[in-house]
């Protein structure tokens, strides 16, 4: 039986594509394995998926771009993770390793290359993260969501592979209940803060609940169960799975962070959106770059977190609603998306 090893983690964005691809390989008779951190979100997501995947936990160390005494300890963790991954590779002898990035992916990528296993990696952001910069040196091929520099000879630009489906599913009962609390004469605004929510969005909704719910129906994915609430023109929930796409479809506008997975999902369904990227003090600036790219393409509006107020947000929302047709036309004309089926066929072709 053919074997494939997946890796990637730290955030949901480093796991999502793997979760989409693994069922395809399982259906085609592959034995599927995953290397990650048993304490990480990658392990949680695989357990929730119920997929027939064997998980292998390794030691991980965070890759930092700044000086920290923890770097010394993490060098040893990464080294031990490489040794553990090498033993896994030599025992399994897989035909391929597929990496979605994140610091947990570096040891398996290095181990795969050392043991002669072809390495395929995927980069979602406009600029490569540190983990993928290292992984690229060991990769057989890299697939990218955005176009990359021509000097990167192993990169193939494939566009975004999203989890949003074109199929219309029956409305969940919970969605019907939510809609009974909404005023259908008002626009609906969905706040999406990534897998763990966004404190800045939660605080804005908490501080301005009265003003917001007088003008909009508000959906707030918080990442914090203590904020859960369903009341007039307001639905706050910590986490959703099957309800995610129905909520996207219900919303007129989405206010989101600038993670590539989320904004390309919005592009795929031509949903109006305001991007509030993580600042450079909290990230490497990749979300700022992603947001600027989407604004330049005419897909979205952006708003820096330091400038986020009720008034500044309402100005962006009003502008999007007033120019809805223009934004949606540009999104619908985009050639930057690839179906999961097409990407899977491309990956299989490259393996042959």
Curated annotation (Swiss-Prot):
Keywords: Cell cycle, Cell division, Cell membrane, Cell shape, Cell wall biogenesis/degradation, Glycosyltransferase, Membrane, Peptidoglycan synthesis, Transferase. CDD domains: GT28_MurG. It catalyses: Mur2Ac(oyl-L-Ala-gamma-D-Glu-L-Lys-D-Ala-D-Ala)-di-trans,octa-cis-undecaprenyl diphosphate + UDP-N-acetyl-alpha-D-glucosamine = beta-D-GlcNAc-(1->4)-Mur2Ac(oyl-L-Ala-gamma-D-Glu-L-Lys-D-Ala-D-Ala)-di-trans,octa-cis-undecaprenyl diphosphate + UDP + H(+). GO terms for molecular function: undecaprenyldiphospho-muramoylpentapeptide beta-N-acetylglucosaminyltransferase activity. The keyword Cell division applies. The keyword Secreted does not apply. GO terms for biological process: carbohydrate metabolic process; cell division; cell wall organization; lipid glycosylation; peptidoglycan biosynthetic process; regulation of cell shape. One of its GO terms (cellular component) is plasma membrane. It is an enzyme of class 2 (transferase). Pathway: Cell wall biogenesis; peptidoglycan biosynthesis. It comes from the Bacteria. It is a peripheral membrane protein. It is found in: Cell membrane. UDP-N-acetyl-alpha-D-glucosamine binds at residues 195, 287. Its EC number is 2.4.1.227. Belongs to the glycosyltransferase 28 family. MurG subfamily. Cell wall formation. Catalyzes the transfer of a GlcNAc subunit on undecaprenyl-pyrophosphoryl-MurNAc-pentapeptide (lipid intermediate I) to form undecaprenyl-pyrophosphoryl-MurNAc-(pentapeptide)GlcNAc (lipid intermediate II). This is UDP-N-acetylglucosamine--N-acetylmuramyl-(pentapeptide) pyrophosphoryl-undecaprenol N-acetylglucosamine transferase.
């Amino acid at each position: 039986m053919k074997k494939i090893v997946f890796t990637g983690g730290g955030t949901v964005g480093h796991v999502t594509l793997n979760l989409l691809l693994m069922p395809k390989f399982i259906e085609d008779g592959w034995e599927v394995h995953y290397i990650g951190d048993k304490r990480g979100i990658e392990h949680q997501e695989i357990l929730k998926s119920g997929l027939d995947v064997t998980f292998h936990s390794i030691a991980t160390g965070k890759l930092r771009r700044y000086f920290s005494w923890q770097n010394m300890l993490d060098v040893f963790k990464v080294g031990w993770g490489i040794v553990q991954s090498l033993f896994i590779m030599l025992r399994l002898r897989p035909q391929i390793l597929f990496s979605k990035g994140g610091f947990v992916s570096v040891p398996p990528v290095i181990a795969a290359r050392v043991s002669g296993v072809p390495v395929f990696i995927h980069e979602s952001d406009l600029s490569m993260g540190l983990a993928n910069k290292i992984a690229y040196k060991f990769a057989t091929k890299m697939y990218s969501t955005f176009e990359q520099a021509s000097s990167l000879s192993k990169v193939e630009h494939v566009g975004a592979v999203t989890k949003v489906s074109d199929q219309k599913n029956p409305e969940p009962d919970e969605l019907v209940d939510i809609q009974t609390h909404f005023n259908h004469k008002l626009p609906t605004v969905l706040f999406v803060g990534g897998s763990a929510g966004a404190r800045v969005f939660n605080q804005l909704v908490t501080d301005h609940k009265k003003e917001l719910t007088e003008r909009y129906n508000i959906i707030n994915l918080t990442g914090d169960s203590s904020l859960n609430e369903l009341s007039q023109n307001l639905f706050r929930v910590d986490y959703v799975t099957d309800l995610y796409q129905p909520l996207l479809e219900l919303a007129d506008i989405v206010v989101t962070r600038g993670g590539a997975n989320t904004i390309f999902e919005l592009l795929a369904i031509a949903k109006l959106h305001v991007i509030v990227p993580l600042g450079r003090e909290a990230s490497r600036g990749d979300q700022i770059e992603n947001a600027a790219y989407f604004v330049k393409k005419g897909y979205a509006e952006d708003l820096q977190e330091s400038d986020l107020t009720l008034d500044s947000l309402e100005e962006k929302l009003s502008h999007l609603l007033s120019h809805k047709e223009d934004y949606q036309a540009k999104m619908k004309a985009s050639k930057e998306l690839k179906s999961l089926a097409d990407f899977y066929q491309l990956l299989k072709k490259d393996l042959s």
